[in-house]
């Protein structure tokens, strides 16, 4: 697996109930968050994200995915899984505006693993608190579709919204 460059892109193919909702294409901020970019692209190249879901969607805020527990139909554990390793925080000056890709974490700043989120609205209260490591190039309308889906009390969509992630140069 090669090192990510400024030309590296990720394509998230999104589907629900066997119907394609579209693709979200991402470019990365490898200059300010190289560890997070490397982690995400490596996990994607290994197929880690394939079959995971967008397990947390909050209108006016973001869509979150990347939890391996979301492959299980038991939603009680969704949002609690990871890859078995952590990535050190790389907080940076990139603002959490609409379309920004950032890494989810627990209260520990150095606890990011595999879960990520895409802002569907500006969220500057996250600046310098979470690691922004990329942005949507095309397909933000797909995230907008996902964020409006009916969800349960934990903001988990009632219908599975699965992803497949591929990396290209």
Say what each PLM segment does.
Residues 1-169:
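Cyclophilin-like peptidyl-prolyl cis-trans isomerases
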């Amino acid at each position: 697996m090669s090192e990510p460059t400024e030309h590296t892109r990720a394509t998230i193919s999104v589907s629900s109930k066997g119907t394609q909702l579209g693709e979200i294409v991402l470019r990365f901020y490898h200059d300010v968050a190289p560890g997070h970019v490397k982690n995400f692209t490596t996990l994607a190249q290994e197929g880690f994200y394939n079959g995971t879901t967008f397990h947390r969607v909050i209108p006016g805020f973001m869509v979150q995915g990347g939890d391996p527990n979301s492959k299980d139909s038991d939603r009680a554990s969704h949002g609690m899984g990871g890859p078995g390793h952590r990535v050190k925080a790389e907080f940076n000056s990139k603002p959490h505006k609409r379309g920004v890709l950032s890494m989810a974490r627990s209260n520990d700043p150095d606890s990011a693993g595999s879960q990520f989120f895409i802002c569907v609205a500006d969220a500057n209260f996250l600046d310098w608190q979470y690691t922004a490591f990329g942005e949507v190039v095309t397909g933000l309308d797909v995230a907008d579709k996902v964020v409006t889906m009916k969800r349960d009390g934990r903001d988990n969509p009632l219908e599975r919204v699965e992803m497949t992630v591929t990396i290209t140069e």
